[in-house]
């Protein structure tokens, strides 16, 4: 009888041990240690976050996210990039589908009610992209008689509709690539979003000479790293990584590599203020 009890106890310990191993083996770890990490980025933004046909990831946000992950203790091979469309970023963070999001994610009060941010790490401005031969749009009010394209979930569309051109015919598409196609085919007259995103598209080889930026600074767009609300430890670590990225010259290197070909004039790295 004692033998049976001992065997049962040993079996119970073994089951508990195996269960703990199964639960913890593949999860993200804030300090790396051989674990994997999933990061949300854009897949359709040249110069910022782009998944190429051969499955590689390029862009400023990709470089920033990779730098942060390495500072958190992860190797490049341990990073999985997950698509983070504008309308899905908060859900991806809250559901734990990603550890953090680096996807042209403008810091604002509405979003901060749902998620926390580290940063900012980049300052962009809202602008307009039009066809190269179109001189009818030179200011925001010209949009009142035009079809304006933006991406669902983006702050740019609300900014234009509420403050700048309330009579604009707003066309919300699922991705920027769709807006670019619509602009080229004259289904829409202009695309609005951050100038960094627009410059990336305009600089693509297949788009060179077809489009131009109007040159309007319609808003300030401070990009931050989105993370789960209340995770102060991760916020502190990411802020430290961002500061180091600027101090060691990596930020300048990433900017030159990703925006240089578009002749896009970036502003200096903004001061990290979130969490302070």
Indicate where each model-derived feature is located.
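C-terminal motif of bacterial Sec signal peptides marking the signal peptidase cleavage site
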Residues: 17-22
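Extended ligand-binding regions for polar small-molecule ligands
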Residues: 24, 70-71, 134, 154, ...
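Extracytoplasmic small-molecule ligand-binding "clamshell" domains
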Residues: 31-101
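Bilobed "Venus flytrap"/periplasmic-binding protein-like clamshell domains
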Residues: 39, 46, 57-71, 125-178, ...
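Periplasmic-binding protein-like
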Residues: 43, 123-130, 203-239, 261-276
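Acidic, polar ligand-binding/catalytic clefts
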Residues: 79-142
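Short helix-initiation/N-cap motifs at beta->coil->alpha
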Residues: 79-91, 135-136, 171-181, 185, ...
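A ligand-binding cleft/hinge motif common to bilobed small-molecule-binding domains
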Residues: 104-113, 161-162, 189-220
């Amino acid at each position: 009888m004692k033998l049976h009890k001992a065997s049962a106890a040993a079996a119970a310990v073994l089951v508990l041990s195996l269960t703990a191993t199964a639960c913890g083996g593949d999860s993200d770890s804030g300090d790396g240690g051989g674990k994997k990490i999933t990061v949300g980025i854009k897949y359709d933004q040249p110069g910022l976050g782009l998944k190429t046909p051969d499955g590689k990831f390029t862009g400023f946000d990709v470089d920033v996210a990779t730098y942060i992950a390495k500072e958190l203790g992860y190797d490049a091979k341990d990073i999985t990039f997950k698509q983070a469309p504008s309308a899905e970023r908060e859900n991806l963070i809250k559901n734990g589908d990603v550890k953090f999001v680096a996807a042209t994610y403008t810091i604002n009060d509405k979003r901060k009610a749902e998620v926390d941010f580290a940063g900012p790490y980049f300052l962009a401005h809202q602008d307009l992209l039009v066809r190269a031969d179109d001189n009818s749009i030179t200011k925001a009010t010209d949009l009142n008689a035009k079809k304006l394209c933006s991406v669902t979930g983006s702050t740019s569309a609300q900014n234009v509709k509420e403050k700048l051109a309330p009579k604009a015919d707003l066309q919300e598409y699922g991705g920027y690539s769709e807006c670019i196609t619509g602009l080229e085919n004259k289904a829409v007259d202009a695309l609005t979003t951050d100038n960094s995103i627009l410059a990336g598209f305009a600089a693509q080889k297949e788009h060179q000479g077809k489009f131009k930026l109007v040159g309007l600074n319609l808003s300030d767009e401070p990009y931050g790293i989105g993370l789960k609300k209340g995770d102060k430890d991760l916020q502190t670590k990411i802020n430290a990584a961002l500061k180091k990225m600027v101090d060691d010259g990596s930020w300048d290197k990433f900017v030159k590599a990703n925006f240089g070909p578009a002749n896009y004039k970036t502003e200096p790295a903004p001061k990290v203020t979130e969490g302070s």
